A protein has these predicted regions:
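Conserved catalytic-core segment of NTP-binding enzymes
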Residues: 116-119, 135-153, 167-277
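Short acidic/polar alpha-helix capping motifs at helix-coil junctions
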Residues: 82, 110, 172-176
Length: 282
C-alpha cells in the first residue's frame, strides 16, 4: 500500500522505527480516505507534516554586537572526534566576521595537535586571533586564557573548541564540567551557548550522543554536519520529537559540504524536500 511504501521510505532515511510509526499514525489520522489511496496527495501531506515537526527546533544562532559595557559571548563546541567540529568553528568564525562581529578562537582540543593546527590555520586565513597552548596542556587553562584575552580585547564572540570526547572516557566528560567551572569564574553567564556537533550519518546513535553530552553540560544547540552525500539525517526528526531534560534542543546550523558556504541555517522546508527527493514516488 501507499502507506507501507512511505513507511519504508522514512526508515531508509534513518528516521528510526519509533518516530516513523508516530509519523505514519499522525498521517493516517490527518489524511482522508481519498488521500490514503493517492500516493501524490499522501506525499504532499507527509511533506507538510515533516516540516511542522522540524519547525519547532529550527533556530539559527543570532549574535548581536557587544554592548559597550557587556562581556564577550562565549560559545563552547563539543562532540566526538571526526564529526567536523573544528571545521564548523572555522566556518562559523568566518560567518560571524562577515556579519561585522569581532571574533576570537580558543584551541581547547589540546589532545590532538592537528586540531590546534587546524584552528590556527583558520585563524590565519580569516585574520582572527587564536589562543592556544602546547599539545597536551590543560584545556581548561586554554579556555580561561582565552576568556581573559577576549574580555581584555573586547571582542564580540569567543568560540572555544574542546577535545573530541569519546563516550567511554568519563574523565573527558569531567573535564567539560571543569572547563565550564573555570570560565564561570570570569563570567557567571558563560558559556552563553554549548553547541554539540553531530555527524548526520550516525543515525540513531546521535540520540545517545545528545543524551550523554547533555548530562555533562547542558546543551543549547546542535549543528548537524555531513548532510551531503548518502547520509539523509532523518534522525533529526527523532531529535525534534525528543525532550532532553526539560527542553528540545534547537538545530542551529547544518553542514551540507566541505565549502565555507556549506554551513547553512537549518530551514525545514528545504531540508524535507531534499530528504524526500531521493524517495520521490514515480
Amino acid at each position: 500500500s501507499a502507506l507501507e511504501d512511505l513507511e519504508a521510505a522514512l526508515l531508509m532515511t534513518d528516521v528510526g522505527m519509533e518516530t516513523t510509526q508516530a509519523i505514519i499514525t499522525e498521517l493516517t489520522e490527518r489524511a482522508g480516505r481519498r488521500e490514503l489511496a493517492n500516493m501524490a496527495a499522501l506525499y504532499q501531506a507527509l511533506q507538510e507534516l515533516l516540516v511542522q515537526r522540524l519547525e519547532g527546533v529550527a533556530q539559527p544562532l543570532a549574535v548581536e554586537p557587544r554592548a559597550a559595557d557587556a562581556l564577550p559571548k562565549v560559545f563552547f563546541f563539543v562532540g566526538v572526534n571526526g564529526v567536523g567540529k573544528t571545521t564548523t568553528i572555522g566556518k562559523l568564525a568566518r560567518r560571524f566576521k562577515n556579519q561585522g562581529l569581532s571574533v576570537m578562537l580558543a584551541a581547547g582540543d589540546t589532545f590532538r595537535a592537528a586540531a590546534v593546527e587546524q584552528l590556527q590555520s583558520w585563524g590565519q586565513r580569516e585574520d582572527i586571533p587564536v589562543i592556544a597552548q602546547a599539545q597536551g596542556s590543560d584545556s581548561a587553562s586554554v579556555a580561561f586564557d582565552a576568556v581573559q584575552s577576549a574580555q581584555a580585547k573586547g571582542v564580540d564572540v569567543l568560540l572555544v573548541d574542546t577535545a573530541g570526547r569519546l563516550q567511554a572516557k568519563s574523565q573527558l566528560m569531567d573535564e567539560l564540567a571543569k572547563i565550564q567551572r573555570v570560565v564561570k569564574r570570569l563570567d557567571e553567564q558563560a558559556p552563553h551557548e554549548v553547541i554539540l556537533v553531530l555527524d548526520g550519518g550516525v543515525g540513531q546513535n546521535a540520540l545517545s550522543q545528545v543524551k550523554l553530552f547533555n548530562q555533562s553540560i547542558p546543551l543549547t544547540g546542535l549543528v548537524v554536519t555531513k548532510l551531503d552525500g548518502t547520509a539523509k539525517a532523518g534522525v533529526l526528526f527523532a531529535l525534534a520529537s525528543q525532550s532532553f531534560g526539560s527542553q528540545r534542543i534547537p538545530v542551529r546550523f547544518i553542514g551540507v559540504g566541505e565549502g565555507i558556504e556549506d554551513l547553512r541555517t537549518f530551514e525545514p522546508e528545504a531540508f524535507v524536500s531534499a530528504l524526500l527527493q531521493a524517495e520521490e514516488p514515480a
